[in-house]
Structure formats: C-alpha cells, structure tokens
Amino acid sequence: MRLVKSTETLEKNEKKLLYMCNARPVLKMRALFSDATKDYRNPPECDPGDSVDLRLRTGKYNVNKAYLCTDNGEYRMERVDSDNLFDYYEASVTVSEKILSYYFKVETAHGAVCYYNQIGASRELNQYYNFRIIPGYKVPSWAKGAVMYQIFVDRFANGRPQNNVLDDEYNYIGEHVNEVKDWYKYPEPMGVREFYGGDLQGVWDKLDYLENLGVDVIYFNPLFVSPSNHKYDIQDYDYIDPHIAMIVSDEGEVLAPGDHDNTHATRYIDRVTNRRNLEASNIYFAQLVEEIHKRGMKVIIDGVFNHCGSFNKWLDREHIYSRSRDQYESGAYERFESPYHSFFKFYSDQWPDNGSYDGWWGHDTLPKLNYEGSKKLEEYILDIGKKWVSEPYNVDGWRLDVAADLGYSPEYNHEFWKKFRKSVKDANPQAVILAEHYGDSYDWLSGGEWDTVMNYDAFMEP
C-alpha cells in the first residue's frame, strides 16, 4: 500500500519541491540520450557530401527547445517522434571532408538549459567530449557486433604432441623450460616456462566446436616464434612458432642439468631457426586460416610492436642465431656492426655482448624497439603489418599490444600508427585494427589510426 501525505503534514522544503514539480517542471537530465549508433546517427558512417540525420531523446513533454550545435553553428531540432516516455528530436547536417564536432543543447519553457555529448548530460559544457563525425572513416562491417573468442594457444588443445616444448629444451629467465604432463595442473606463479602443449592443430581439431558455439572471430594471442608460453616477447616476426605449428626437422640435444648456456640448446636452435620448420609453419598457418574462413569465421592476430624479446634475431642475446645452420645476420647484442644496431637504444658502447639496451619497463627480456632511431625498423614492421593480412595468410586484422607505448614520444606514436593503418588498409581494406589501451583513446580514434580499442577500462574499473 502506498501512503501519501496530505499537504497539511508536508514540511516546508517538501511543499517547495511539490510546487516546483508541478508549476515548474524539472528538466529530466537522465532522460537525455544520444550516441553514434544507427538509431541516433543515420548513417553511422558516411563519406564527404553525405547528409546525416542526428537524433536526441528527451523526457516526454519535458523540453521546450532542442538544438544541434556544430562547428558551423546552432540548429533548431524538430520533434519527429514520441512514445510513452520520451520525445525524439532530429536535425540533419551535410558533412564535408573535415571532422564535424557536435553536441546537443536543450531548454525548458522556464529557461533551464542542459547540454549533452559523449560524457552525458551536464549543466556545463565540456567540448572535449563532443560527438564527432569523421567522413570516410569506416570500421569493417563484419567486426560490428561480432562474437570474438580469444585463444591462448598453449592452453587451448594439444593436437600435435610431437611438437611439444621438451623438458630442458632451453633456458629462459634463469631456469630450464619444462613440459607439463598433466593438462589439468594448476600453473605455477612464475609459469612462463611451463608449456602445456596447446597448438594450432588443437585449434583446427576444435573448429566444429567453435563454429557450433557461435563464434564469429578467433582472436589469437601471439603466434610468432618466442621462448615464453605467452609469446609477448617475440623472437621472429616473420614466422609462426614451429612448436605450435609444424616441426619437420628435429635434431640436436636439450640442455644438461645445470647448464644455462643456450648455445648448447641445439634442439631448440634447430626447431626455431631452421627455415624448413619456419616455412612449414607458415604454410600450415595459411591453411588453418583458409579452413577457418570456409566456416564463415574471421581471424585476428596479436601484434607486439612496442618491444620484442631478448631472444629476437635482431638482438640475439642468447647467441642462438649465430649457432644456426642457416645463415643469419649478427645480432645487435653481439656486435656493434650488426645491421640491427639502430633497432635498439643502447646506453653504453661496450661490445661484444652489450646488455645496456633499453628494456620496456626495465625488463631485459623485453627490449624496447627504437623506431625514432631506425627508419629500417619502421619499414620492417610496416611490412609485417601488411604481410600477415595479405596472401597467402589473409588474416582479418591486428590486435595491437600496448599500442600507446610504441615509440619514445606521443608525436611519433601517432605518426607511426597512421603509417601502419595505411599499410594494412592498402593491403586489405577489410582488416580491422584493434588496439590495447587503458584510459581515454580519443586521440587515436580520429579515423587515421586505430579502428577501435579493447574495453579494458569498463571491465577492470567499471
């Protein structure tokens, strides 16, 4: 039962509020809404010269006037629709080649004013959060609303046990790696050296399951050659790691107990530097992507371009590429004369074996890449971006790791991602560019860099 006070029993402030709600209708700020979806911006994406209809929702009979405010002026909006709770106002604009910034302003009959942009409804306008129309900026339609399934390959399914990382195969961060025999064993706290044996054949074997689950896109954590199970310390951007793909040459020995010298890890050296293994792994990956596409699913791979790994062939801190039966250039750790010297920032000139390179967040296993100091490095990574979205691999997009950290300045970071976008989109216009970023991604989403970001903020700190 609802109890209602009589006006005689109301306190003074309650009487005042009752009067205001009846004589001076309160502006219902929470009823205001607009966004960049088709319901409120039609079309959501446009080209120069297109007419775009912009819509604002308000409380029913709550607003006297509504305005669309753009860089070019203020336009009175027309009420075009209503339902039981809301009114809908609309205005149209014709876009040019320039980005169009806009927000909404509403007024009540009694002069109350409120603004609405991406931050929501407010009494004071902060134009930093205005909506933007970016002519020509289009995200691939297949990515919108797609169900994406992330696969950390080592922990998904083991389809080719003969490729498993072996006990003592090599040394990583001070200890030997090991093969986990019990798939259900809980990982150790420092479990980067533990390999459960998941591989791409395991993914292939489960494609029926993924398809029946309703997956639209498979997003793979890094797949390139790497000594860790997470593979965010890439050793070779040109090849899929044979441990998760195809090993056709498998010669050499594992490390003896107590031996931490990876030049003696000849089994590992053969597995990851022998071009027969590397080329077979790339061919296998191309076949897997083709099979995934046949089932109507897409593939996104992880691009770790801010830093590489200390095992990387450009640095070769472990001296494994200099021990390979195939010919590789000397690494920048080994020799000052290395063709990759400029790929890294060194703080001393003490060669050979110069360990003074800059590591991302101080981690010597994650050498930061020195783009500003090396045009050759920049061109190499731009070619990598193009390579994997092109024939024969035909990957459908990149997920960019710590994308805002790349480079040593914000100015260069934006410059690089503009070049990366052009390189990728020229090769495959339907490839998506999805960045990892915490915080406000506004500056990267102006149509010339990333397509979108992973929504870490909302999930981790809602």
Language-model-derived ranges and their functions:
Residues 147-149, 218-220, 299-301, 398, ...:
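Hydrophobic faces of well-ordered beta-strands that scaffold small-molecule active sites
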Residues 141, 311-315, 385-386, 392-394, ...:
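Conserved alpha/beta catalytic core and glycan-binding cleft of carbohydrate-active enzymes
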Residues 59, 105-107, 134, 152-154, ...:
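Structured loops at beta-to-helix junctions and adjacent beta-edge loops in soluble globular domains
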Residues 1-145, 149-150:
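Glycan-association/targeting regions that enable binding to alpha-glucans and other polysaccharides
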Residues 58-60, 81, 93-95, 152-157, ...:
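Short, flexible loop/turn elements at secondary-structure junctions
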Residues 153-216, 222-392, 420, 426, ...:
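Substrate-binding/active-site clefts of carbohydrate-active enzymes
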Residues 367-375, 402-421:
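Active-site cleft segment of glycoside hydrolase catalytic domains centered on the general acid/base Glu
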